Regions:
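Conserved class I S-adenosyl-L-methionine
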Residues: 9-51, 65-69, 87, 142-172, 199, ...
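Class I SAM-dependent methyltransferase SAM/SAH-binding core
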Residues: 57-59, 63-103
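A short acidic, Gly/Pro-enriched loop at the edge of an enzyme's catalytic core
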Residues: 102-114
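A short SAM/SAH-binding and catalytic strip from SAM-dependent methyltransferases
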Residues: 113-126
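A short glycine-rich, Lys/Arg-flanked "PGG" loop and its adjoining helix->strand segment in the class I
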Residues: 127-142
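Short alpha-helix
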Residues: 173-195
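Conserved Class I S-adenosyl-L-methionine
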Residues: 192-232
Length: 232
């Protein structure tokens, strides 16, 4: 039996997440700007769908690092959606939409691919998120997403940043096990093609100040999950 968070808690979570990103936006560049993001982006690009001539959604686009990649991939149209306007205003080259990833403001079956980087844990309901993604995908359309691994969060890792005032802030993040995500995809009519797990000190091994101690402490812990799925 699964316990589901109450609606009031989920609304509070979404509000807290939005406030965190509004604080983060002024210091959040539209690039993979840390070792984790660089490892994640390399792995995402290795399973990148062919979007040439297609219509693609960059879901929860942030400041637009994947929108930039998509625009260089010769997609016919790139649509970037995010709920944080200060983040969205940094996106270049894409059609920008400010909205919720839980209720996508698009007609059904209009995208050839949906890309989402490190954002699934901000979904207040994973089944609804997968259902909305599947709805806007065309038949045989591709979903490619990454997120922070549930094992990393359970091991004690947090998602945090330093704002303009050099104050460390934590970003709220839901924990969705892979099995939970698999169930949600199956219910939405999405078939998994690829699953990747990036582990501390193995796939994620770029040196940075203090990295030796970090990798020793967390060695082998999965820190990023990457999934590619196809709409049936």
């Amino acid at each position: 039996m699964r316990a589901y968070p109450c609606r009031r808690f989920l609304m509070s979570l979404a509000s807290s997440t939005l406030k965190a990103y509004e604080r983060w936006a002024p210091v959040y560049p539209p690039t993979a700007h840390n070792p984790l993001m660089r490892a994640e982006q390399r792995s995402m690009l290795e399973v990148w769908p062919n979007v040439e001539g297609g219509r693609v959604l960059d879901l929860a686009c942030g400041s637009g690092r994947y929108s930039h990649v998509l625009c260089k991939s010769n997609a016919a149209q790139v649509v970037a959606l995010d709920f944080c306007l200060p983040m969205l205003t940094q996106v270049a080259g894409a059609s920008r939409v400010c909205g919720s990833m839980m209720q996508l403001p698009f007609q059904s079956g209009v995208f050839d691919a949906v890309i989402s980087g490190l954002a699934v844990g901000h979904a207040t309901d994973i089944r609804q998120w997968m259902s909305e993604v599947a709805r806007v995908l065309r038949p045989a359309g591709i979903l490619l997403y990454s997120d922070f691994h549930s094992e990393a969060i359970r091991a004690g890792m947090t998602r945090s940043f330093k704002d303009e005032d050099d104050v460390t802030r934590t970003v709220p993040h839901q924990v969705y096990d892979l099995s939970c995500q698999q169930d949600a995809m199956a219910a939405a009519g999405l078939t998994i093609e690829t699953v990747r797990e990036l582990r501390m000190g193995i796939e994620l091994n770029e040196a940075f100040p203090g990295s030796e101690g970090v990798y020793r402490k967390w060695y082998g812990v999965p820190v990023v999950l990457i999934v590619r799925a196809r709409k049936e």
